[in-house]
Amino acid sequence: MEVRHDWTVAEVRALLEKPFMDLMFEAQVVHRQYQEHNHVQVSTLLSIKTGACPEDCKYCPQSAHYRTDVDKERLMEVERVLDAAQKAKNAGSTRFCMGAAWKNPKERDMPHLTDMIKGVKGMGLETCMTLGMLTPDQAGELADAGLDYYNHNLDTSPEFYGSIITTRTYQDRLDTLSHVRDAGMKICSGGIIGMGESTNDRAGLLVELANLPVHPESVPINMLVKVKGTPMENVDDVESFDFVKLIAIARIMMPMSAVRLSAGRENMNEQMQAMCFMAGANSIFYGCKLLTTPNPDEDTDMQLFKKLGINSQQVAQKPDEIQENELLDQVVERVAARPTKDDMFYDATV
């Protein structure tokens, strides 16, 4: 099967209408052709700035527009981020993702963010950030610091998007992905299933992702986690087989990408997760929380992997020890040189 960038909604609809077992078989064949089977990459996600986001994404408990139980927090200290990254590495993660509830980072944020990247890289982990929209210069600055992946989801189809978010446009999201790609970083971009979208909208999301000039290296498929206080708290649940089908179709359409089984796993039983892995999912977030929503704990995931005979990816080749120590020393020196803790870790929500 060739890698394509010219998919249509009609083609995706045709895949959705296939018998379930036939679709699963096709996805598994593609998966084994392009990916290492029985292998799952493990990432950890940390919220480095939580709550009070000015965006109005209707699914998000961190939005300042809704009354939820999420408290706003300041930008996390670099030392705390590095401590969390070390714990994630010790638990088996190979990629450390850092998320901030912003519309976009301000220039005052950039030195702290680049220190986080360099410190985590110094541990031998891959790095990923999700910070909202980026300018070309900001993308270049993150890339120069060594950021491997940047996450910026499309969320849904262009047609349904305006029903979910009004504070940034679909084109804003596509522009940020272009800036990230132009800066030389890898892209993590996917969407959310279960927000009341139609079958055509689900197909349209996958078409948008698969028809990018280069497929995202990582495609997170999230199942909506309904949070009290958001406009999405009472939407209907996603039918399990429908969700698994979308994992399979993402694998078929983007065969070289990692398809990440992302938010919503806490609400999936072992059998549903196993079907998702069979359908081509080969990446998960590891740890008890995704930003502010629950996630299965590490022991539960390892038990499931053992039952299924799945191997989690081990930490990639460690950087040269001298280089690692130099990177960490540079970060510590820069942090120590800054005036005061209060000056450095301002309230990033203002």
From Swiss-Prot:
Residues 38-265 form the Radical SAM core domain. One of its GO terms (molecular function) is 4 iron, 4 sulfur cluster binding. Gene3D superfamilies: Aldolase class I. Keywords: 2Fe-2S, 4Fe-4S, Biotin biosynthesis, Iron, Iron-sulfur, Metal-binding, S-adenosyl-L-methionine, Transferase. Pathway: Cofactor biosynthesis; biotin biosynthesis; biotin from 7,8-diaminononanoate: step 2/2. Binds 1 [4Fe-4S] cluster. The cluster is coordinated with 3 cysteines and an exchangeable S-adenosyl-L-methionine. Binds 1 [2Fe-2S] cluster. The cluster is coordinated with 3 cysteines and 1 arginine. [2Fe-2S] cluster binds at C97, C128, C188, R260. It is an enzyme of class 2 (transferase). GO terms for biological process: biotin biosynthetic process. [4Fe-4S] cluster binds at C53, C57, C60. It comes from the Bacteria. Its cofactor is [4Fe-4S] cluster; [2Fe-2S] cluster. Its EC number is 2.8.1.6. PANTHER family: BIOTIN SYNTHASE, BIOTIN SYNTHASE, MITOCHONDRIAL. Catalyzes the conversion of dethiobiotin (DTB) to biotin by the insertion of a sulfur atom into dethiobiotin via a radical-based mechanism. Belongs to the radical SAM superfamily. Biotin synthase family. Homodimer. This is Biotin synthase. The gene is bioB.
